[in-house]
Amino acid sequence: MDKLPKVAYFCMEFGLHEDFKIYAGGLGILAGDLLKTAKDCKFPLVGVGILWRQGYTKQLIGKNGKPCDCYPEYSYDFLEDTGVTINVRIRGRQVKCKIWKCTCFNNVSLYLLDTNIPENNEPCLTGQLYGWFPEERVAQEMILSIGGVRALKALKIDVDVYHFNDSHPVPAGIELIREKMKKDGMNFKDAWKETRKQIVFTTHTPVIEGNEVHDHKLLKYMGMYNGLTYNQMSQIGGDPFSMTAAGLRLSRKANAVGKLHGVTAKKMWANIQGASEIISITNGVHNGTWQDKRILKAYSDKSDLRETHLLLKKEMLEEIYNRNNIRLKENTLTIGFARRAAPYKRSDLIFKRPEIIELLLKGGKLQLIFSGKAYPNDLTGKKIVANLYSMTKLYPKNIVFLQDYDIKIGKILTRGCDVWLNNPIRPMEASGTSGMKAAMNGVLNLSVLDGWWPEGCKHGVNGWQIGNGYEGEDHERNDSESLYKVLLEEVIPTYYDKKDKWVSMMRSSIEMSSFQFSAERMLKEYYNLMYIQ
């Protein structure tokens, strides 16, 4: 084990527990699962992040039926004070960062930078996760990255590999180059070349518009140049400065988070000269966190999965009643859909043929549970949330929306629903880990062939596919027709009339997902394919 490289895993967010609110969504949950898995496997890895005092957003539905955001101040008594502080120069002023350590969620050490100390003029830089304005965002990324590298050195933690989870940690690469030029006397080209040997990079967003770009004037003003020149920074990130292009040019190897995403990412970044090779390492989830122990025992003992699932479903329905004061029926086919509110995820696709969905809902054949948050400054996403909420008013006995989506809601739904619906516009879903969590609990996936599902789906055996991988302008009509066809001809008849087949499919789903889509498999691939040279 001593021969394994020592890894520092940098990420803007970490989802370790619902009460530790330093995460926004899937990126953070992935990062949290990876730290827990490293602990399980005794791998030499540490996490580097930020202690967000206000977290992401507490998003509730107002009286007008629209989501509204609030930002409570959180304090945590379970963190260890390392006694270490470091400085990062931002906008010409030194910002002091305190370093906290978190190990209390069965995870390897996670070091968190915090500017909320009396010595700082701007203690709020580590207030809200994902700053609203470019200046704030760049400052936060500098704290994570430049501050993270300096924190590890101050803590005397040896690092062989720096893993950038998404492009936010890119300034860490610039800091490593600066160090080599200043302390070791290297020229820029040699320092860059040596730095690349230390960095690996995970790219997530398969949509150009979702990849962060900054104006050079802003970066210079903020201090992200960090001793480098405009010419040197342009060689790394181009002009304007693309954070993803920079990640690809700063790393020795990069990965996409699924096989289909790998194809998409290679096409997207084919014109980036000097980019690292992009391989595919499909995401996975932490079994111990997401797979209910009772369903695992029933699966392992070859006992009645139906009975155990019904128990989990009842627990979910009771939680829904406690939150929403609505009694859903335990014997009705229940479909769950919970994820970030983004247009490409098409949470409303199932409502595209109202004459059919109304018959199914009012006829007692179907009930729907939705949950999800929109980015606070994403008006389109907020409209999606409002539209979903409005459907609960149209069908108050059959549709539920659970507000303020978090890890706890995610656990409840991916254990208690009968079917997990996923219908993004292909190929815009890089991975999508909620379906993996559902699959591990015998909740059957009904999904477009996007993200992870093309790798796991055996139609009619462990879940169902929507369509045949169609990509084109007419995707809305094509996919909605396919969704209804599978729902009416296969999903509903199997649930009500072929109960033994349903249980067999549940067993196949658990068998398919429990290792293939586990974070253990993922992390071992990171070591074998990325970390070990």
Regions found by a protein language model. Name each.
Residues 1-533:
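Catalytic cores of carbohydrate-active enzymes across secretory and cytosolic contexts
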